[in-house]
Amino acid sequence: MAAQNKVRVVVNGYGVIGKHVANAITLQDDMTLTGVVDVVADWRAQAAVQTGMRLFAATPSAADGMRKAGLQVHGTLEDGLRDVDVMIDCTPKRIAAVNVETYRQRKVKYIVQGGEKHSATGHSFVAESNYASAIGRNATRVVSCDTTSIVRTLTALKRAGLLLKARGTLSRRATDPWESHLNGIMNTLVPEDEIPSHQGPDAQTVDGELDVVTMAVKGPETLGHLHYWSVQMMRDASKAEVLDAFRSSARIALIPTRRS
């Protein structure tokens, strides 16, 4: 595709999520990554520059720090907004809620991540569930990993005409691996003190027809999250039919327990 016809994208926040998003954009034939924005001048920003990405600073003071670290800076967030069609905001929770006002003022379409509230965009997104409803919108929110998993799993059953309602218990990791030296828990479990936990209602922002209730507990590990489900079916179904329903999803991998 000709460069002038590609969607120009800037990623704000080059952390773990932002890094993956930016790398994915570089692999698309209908998009071009015009830059990444961050506030720190650590190894992550250095890696972005080394891979040829244009680096912008979130603030003027952040730009000063980056230049002192020897990084080439192409301006601030305001400069990045001059050459963009879509801003993907991967900044930490609650920061994007402030940034969206700037995006709206500049009339730039934007995507935020699951740490923000549904009200930040008025639309929450999981591709397999509600792709069509996102077309033509100026903004959406890609929900968290937990919520995405819930929607993918239950949508597969719903699409097969099997799902009546679901009740789930989530075992969540204590902290992200790259922050395990800063916070987390040890030798204990911390249950969320409200039922439902926030993940179930969050899934309903994507699909309001889901009858889902979740409970969650945080454990002393950083490997990942684990979900257990009790599902009431619309009708009797064989094990093979349930597995086929999950296989119908392009984003669910079935792994035999003997290989796990």
What residue spans do the PLM features occupy?
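N-terminal Rossmann-like NAD(P) cofactor-binding subdomain of oxidoreductases
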Residues: 2-177
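Active-site-lining helix/loop region of Rossmann-like oxidoreductase modules
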Residues: 6-23, 155-258
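Compositionally biased, intrinsically disordered low-complexity regions enriched
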Residues: 86, 91, 104-105, 248-254, ...
